From Swiss-Prot:
This is Probable inorganic carbon transporter subunit DabA. One of its GO terms (cellular component) is plasma membrane. It comes from Geobacillus kaustophilus (strain HTA426). The lineage of its organism: Bacteria, Bacillati, Bacillota, Bacilli, Bacillales. InterPro entries: DabA. The keyword Metal-binding applies.
Length: 870
């Protein structure tokens, strides 16, 4: 019953793409994949960002039916959630009734309802219903077709060889210094390099190499010719190229990322597809043209027909009397509901149950504004891991916390001391506008550079010896005793050895006191970006963040700007645990820049002219929340005023208890730890330095909601580390500009993170990266399973599941909640068509809380339609 039997008309995309230029066809096909960043700057990616013009249901139907990619959890997961109380049965019934109201039904309401309710709760039609002889006879007479897309190589069983060839060439092309020999002709692009080398490839037969003799040297020409030689018709070109992109979406996604980085939207994909389809033609040429594929599959009709007879209240005679069109419509209806509809209703019921519990937790208490002046105000990233830490900080003293995107509104790329490369320290959807450099005086930098150069020399020498043909034979004898001791120590006493090695590395890499290029100092020669900021820009960036989070008055003597970082060992996915808003890097640099800007006298003067008066006694300091050990580390503490010094001492004294409480809460969720570790801080530190630890922390697993509003709304509420918290005060935002910026930036990043976790959970073999213990880092850019697989784009299974059978992450679409008047939400949806489309098509959910009445309003399709018709 899982096989598709729907006969579809030509898709709208196919009709548009027929007879279109090749670039248009490739652009349309590219919507099924997403860019993939290198793993050193792992950024959460929304795998279906190009498909948001379709509804979530239609995208799921299309991917499952045509390519076998399932976007919904299996029924066993829904039943497990039901047994744990995470799904309320009443919501399932409510969603079913609403669905029946909205859907065109091929049968009387009572018959369709009986069928759907039975399919909701049953995994299969009873065997006796399937074995009725007359039913089998009727099923065999139904001319229904499957619509799965099968490329020529798949039909001939050559897809594995084609994938192996593509993996080999992609690894060579993208290598970042790992390979001993660099790929020749790389300057000619992916296709150009392959075209020059493929005729010499010994893995191709003599006949196959001969076929490439007069093959085009230009990628567009090669792709066009390959489509013609393979017999791909214009109307099927988009679907055919989609199938090839989805065969290895990781490598194709890397091609998209590199191409966009170079300012060419689809040039890289044309190169990639030109190589792939050229190879496909080379392999399949002796068998072309293929006979037209037979799509009929009478066997799949039986369970659908049996479902109507067994649960729909029909007899076989009733079925025979139906016109052929009605029978077909009923089968299509049952098939789509079985494959997609029923699980979508279960998903919505799961989401509704979570929303109801969150609504109760938030609205049962009256929001209270702070009654006393805070001693310290702390600005945290919206990351869900900040929520427990913020809650515990606020509980131990006169401290206020705020949430914002962890790049603190600074569209910068950063260049740390002596680095050759600059890192975009802002979200992937934001283009850097400035570069900030870290510098040190020659006197203080000299000792640091000597230590650094010594470590680099040792590392390079070891690497060269390891790769040398003869010297490599001596390396085990030379290094064996030392590496053996290292292995024994890290395995027998992971906490002690890991901590000792970590301390040694920190001491060796300890940087001298550095300064930041905050003021304008010309332009970067490579990127052309201005180094530093003008005085007006400095004022505006600080103002923008303070207004966005509603911190424009009542400043505490101490304001702590907290970036965040994760510290782990032997973890290729380390950047996935760092700050996504900082481009997959630690947030300390941005925190330091913002704090320094906010302390500048001319910035304070500029803010005062804008109506934001920061007292002279208020000092901004930079810190970093280490999420693996729930510790706050100081990045830069300038000279403090007397009041700020007192607040600093008070906060430091409270942080030890905060760390213990936050770690105890977090450790209890990790498998094999127990409800309450004897020493949660020690356990957290062990996991951070243990090189065998596959799950040092849960990261952002469990994320489910994004709340935009005052902290008074949620202060003291236990949100279980599942909610992104962005501070916002609608009273400070009469034009709605700040809200629009939060939705366009942080909320969109939150949606990407949410759908990355969703995809890695529901389709781990496709959108995840499998078992972390069997992965291999390849070319310095990503990971594979073993030494020959797709470039894995998602999260490892250990990031979303406690075991092979137990999921930790609940795959729910992000619920965005905004505390603002009704008119603010209407204006937002009216002006932001992209956000409205996300909500209307089900890629995220939207609710709002009226600040005056406390009413919780759901913004679903019907309400959105009324907004559009205003």
């Amino acid at each position: 019953m899982s096989r598709s039997v729907i006969s579809l008309e030509r898709s709208t995309e196919a009709k548009k793409a027929a007879a279109c230029p090749l670039e248009v066809i490739v652009s349309e096909a590219a919507k099924v994949i997403a860019p993939l960043w290198p793993i050193s700057a792992f950024i959460a990616r929304h795998p279906w960002m190009g498909m948001e013009d379709k509804s979530f249901v239609d995208a799921a139907d299309r991917l499952q039916e045509a390519y076998g990619i399932d976007l919904y959890p299996p029924m066993a997961v829904f039943h497990a959630a039901l047994s744990k109380g995470e799904i309320d049965v009443s919501f399932i019934e409510r969603r079913l009734q609403r669905w029946l109201d909205d859907e065109p039904l091929p049968a009387p309401r009572h018959e369709a309802e009986r069928l759907c309710r039975a399919l909701l709760w049953n995994d299969a039609v009873p065997e006796e219903a399937l074995q009725m002889p007359k039913l089998i006879e009727l099923a065999a007479a139904m001319p229904l077709r499957s619509v799965s897309i099968r490329t020529r190589s798949v039909r001939l069983g050559l897809e594995k060889r084609l994938d192996q060839q593509m993996i080999k060439w992609c690894k060579l092309f993208y290598d970042r210094g790992e390979a001993v020999w660099a790929l020749p002709h790389r300057e000619h692009g992916f296709y150009g390099s392959w075209r020059r080398l493929a005729p010499l490839d010994p893995s191709l037969s003599k006949e196959e190499r001969k076929r490439l003799f007069d093959w085009p040297h230009h990628p567009e020409e090669a792709l066009q010719r390959a489509l013609e030689q393979l017999g791909v018709q214009d109307e099927e070109a988009v679907a055919y190229l989609e199938a090839h992109l989805l065969a290895l979406p990781g490598w194709a996604g890397m091609m998209v990322w590199q191409s966009r980085r170079a300012g060419d939207e689809i040039g890289g994909l044309i190169n990639y597809l030109a190589v792939r389809l050229s190879l496909e033609w080379v392999f399949t040429a002796p068998h072309l043209p293929l006979k037209e594929e037979e799509n009929e599959d009478d066997r799949a009709v039986g369970p659908l027909l049996a479902a109507w007879i067994h649960w729909g209240g029909m007899t076989l005679d009733d079925w025979r009397r139906l016109p052929l069109e009605d029978r077909q419509a009923r089968l299509v209806f049952a098939d789509r509901f079985w494959r997609i509809g029923r699980r979508h209703l279960w998903l919505e019921a799961w989401e509704d149950t979570y929303e109801a519990k969150l609504k109760e937790a938030v609205l049962t208490r009256q929001p209270e504004e702070p009654k006393e002046q805070a001693a310290a105000q702390l600005l945290f990233c919206i990351d869900v891991r900040s929520e427990p830490f913020r809650r515990h900080v606020e509980a131990v003293g006169p401290f206020e916390t705020y949430g914002c995107a962890g790049f603190f509104g600074l569209p910068i790329q950063t260049r740390v001391l002596d680095s050759d490369d600059a890192h975009p320290s802002c979200p992937a959807i934001v283009a850097p506008r400035h570069e900030i450099n870290e510098t040190a005086s020659p006197e203080t930098a000299a000792p640091y550079r000597r230590r650094r150069d010594l470590f680099r020399f040792v590392g390079r020498t070891f690497k060269k010896i390891k790769r040398h043909l003869l010297a490599g034979l001596l390396l085990p004898e030379m290094s064996g005793p030392w590496l053996g001791l290292h292995t024994i120590a890290r395995s027998a006493a992971p906490a002690w050895a890991g901590q000792a090695i970590h301390q040694a590395e920190m001491s060796a890499q300890q940087k001298p006191k550095t300064t930041l290029s905050l003021d304008c100092q010309g332009h970067d020669e490579t990127t052309g970006l201005p180094i530093g900021l003008t005085k007006e820009e400095q004022v505006q960036y600080v103002k923008q963040l303070l207004v966005n989070i509603g911190l424009t008055s009542s400043f505490a003597p101490l304001v702590v700007v907290c970036g965040h970082e994760s510290e782990t060992t032997n973890n290729p996915y380390a950047s996935a645990l760092d700050c996504g808003a900082c481009g997959g890097a630690a947030g300390a640099f941005n925190a330091r820049v913002f704090a320094a800007l906010a302390n500048l006298p001319h910035v304070r003067d500029g803010l005062a002219k804008e109506g934001i008066v920061i007292p002279d006694e208020t000092v901004f300091v930079a810190a970093e929340h280490i999420t693996t050990v729930d510790e706050l580390r100081w990045v830069e503490v300038p000279p403090l005023s007397e009041a700020a010094e007192a607040a600093f001492r008070q906060l430091k004294q409270a942080l030890a208890g905060v760390s213990r409480q936050a770690n105890a809460e977090r450790m209890a969720k990790l498998p094999h730890v127990g409800a309450m570790p004897r020493d949660p801080v020690a356990e957290a530190r062990r996991r951070a330095v243990d090189w065998s630890e596959i799950r040092p922390e849960w990261g952002l697993a469990g994320n489910a909601a994004f709340l935009i509003g005052r902290r008074a709304l949620t202060k003291g509420v236990h949100l279980d580390g599942r909610v992104f918290l962005h501070s916002y005060d609608w009273r400070e935002d009469p034009t709605g500009e700040a809200l629009a910026g939060i939705i366009a930036g942080p909320a969109t990043v939150g949606q990407w993170i949410n759908l990355q976790y969703y995809a890695s959970t529901v389709a781990p073999n496709y959108y995840g990266s499998g078992d972390k213990t069997t992965q291999t880092v390849t070319g310095g850019i990503g990971v594979m399973q073993g030494n020959g697989s797709d470039l894995l784009a998602g999260l490892p299974w250990q990031s979303v599941a406690a075991s092979d059978r137990e999921w930790f992450h609940s795959p729910l679409r992000l619920l965005v909640i905004i505390e603002a008047p009704f008119s603010y939400i209407e204006r937002l949806l009216d002006e932001n068509s992209e956000f409205r489309r996300k909500v209307q098509n089900g890629w995220l959910r939207l609710a709002s809380i009226d600040p005056d009445s406390g009413a919780w309003v759901n913004w679903e399709a019907g309400r959105l339609a009324s907004v559009q018709q205003r």
